[in-house]
């Protein structure tokens, strides 16, 4: 999305979703933010109806309890919380609320300061390390390794860590 719209006016949501399913995806990541990313809450409902057994991450700027509850109502399985967007009290509250609603929570960090804050969240279990610099929009996939090295070993053993952004080809993942 930082390089323009992902889809054009001919975008067929179900056709694209089926392509992903046929190629073995483990979960959908659905943009619902409308203004900047042209997402739509209806995308989650459509995907849930057609692929009821595949987890769905709602990608949006989540900053209120209502949005967390609405995510559950829409049929998503998980939310994204961007550490940089939230003060610690709100971050912890939304994380706890989501877990109470049986939603998984992908907590996204971009740098060492974000990471320090994220690691203080009680019951943190999924950590996303975004390789995109939010100030310059440049991508450096080595950011994941740099930040993983800052995580205590005892936490690495229990966290699911997701490397986000900057992967264009299979070779990038290797």
Which residue stretches match the model-derived regions?
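Mobile, glycine- and charge-enriched loop segments
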Residues: 48, 152-153
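Active-site-proximal loop->helix
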Residues: 45, 70-74, 93-97
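Glycine-rich phosphate-binding active-site loops on the catalytic face of alpha/beta enzymes
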Residues: 26, 30, 70-90, 128-136
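Glycine-rich beta-to-alpha active-site loop
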Residues: 60-63, 73
């Amino acid at each position: 999305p930082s390089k323009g719209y992902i889809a054009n006016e001919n975008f067929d949501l179900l056709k694209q979703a089926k392509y992903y399913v046929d190629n073995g995806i483990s979960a959908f990541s659905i943009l619902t933010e409308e203004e900047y990313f042209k997402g739509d809450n209806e995308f989650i409902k459509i995907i849930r109806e057609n692929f009821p057994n595949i987890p769905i991450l709602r990608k949006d700027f989540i900053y209120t309890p209502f949005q967390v509850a609405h995510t559950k109502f829409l049929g998503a399985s998980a939310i994204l919380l961007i550490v940089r967007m939230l003060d610690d009290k709100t971050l912890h509250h939304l994380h706890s609320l989501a877990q109470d609603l049986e939603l998984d929570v992908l907590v996204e960090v971009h740098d060492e300061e974000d990471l320090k804050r994220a690691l203080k969240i009680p019951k943190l279990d999924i950590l996303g390390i975004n390789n995109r610099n939010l100030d310059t929009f440049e991508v450096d996939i080595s950011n994941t390794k740099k930040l993983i090295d800052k995580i205590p070993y005892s936490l690495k053993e229990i966290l699911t860590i997701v490397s986000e952004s900057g992967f264009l080809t299979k070779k990038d993942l290797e």
